[in-house]
Amino acid sequence: MFKQQFIFHWCVVFLISALVIALPVRISHAESAEPDFLNVALGGYDVHDDWNAVEARLEYRSNMELSVFRPFTGFMTTNDRSMYGYGGVLVDVFFSPRIVLQPSLAVGAYAKGSGKDLGHWIQFRTQLELAWRFDDRSRAGLSLSHMSNAHLSSNNQGTEAVMLNYAVPFDRIAGKSIWE
């Protein structure tokens, strides 16, 4: 019971904090709704401990808005054959038309391969990404994420990743939004 309360508590704290931070900033940029994105990322996995693995990600970031939140889904893999499929919510916080901070929260299924044992197949990921927004709305950024099982198991080492991200508007790839 304590584990579920702990997870719920931190999810609520994250979402309320993101809402409080993003709502006033987002409203000032509401006239320019963002497109959906295909994000590719490459970087270091388990950077706090070993930094002995490379991580690659592919994400779809929807343009559907649920208040200030936008859903996303993705897949991550490492050269250790660890894999993680996930979905969650994110918030765009615009500090200017070019500078975007994007906190996100996701939950998904993890398979360790020959990589790090994170103690449970269910993993939660929190991430902060700081990106530069180009004229065509594509973004290049740096992200820092933490992934752990939030004490669903007594083995809860967690891991961190530092990633270089490039998000391209989906309509530039497919010629239209995925929802059209």
Regions found by a protein language model. Give the residues of each.
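Cleavable N-terminal export/targeting peptides
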Residues: 1-34, 171-180
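Solvent-exposed loop/turn segments connecting transmembrane beta-strands
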Residues: 44-54, 75-86, 113-121, 151-159
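Repeated loop/turn-to-beta-strand initiation elements of outer-membrane beta-barrel proteins
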Residues: 38, 65-70, 97-101, 136-142, ...
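Hydrophobic, lipid-facing positions within transmembrane beta-strands of outer-membrane proteins
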Residues: 38, 52-58, 69-71, 83-89, ...
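Residue-level signature of outer-membrane beta-barrel architecture
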Residues: 60-64, 91-93, 132, 146, ...
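Outer-membrane beta-barrel "beta-signal"
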Residues: 54, 157-180
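Outer-membrane beta-barrel initiation region
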Residues: 28-63, 172-177
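Transmembrane beta-barrel strands of outer-membrane/channel proteins
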Residues: 40-44, 73-77, 103-109, 142-146
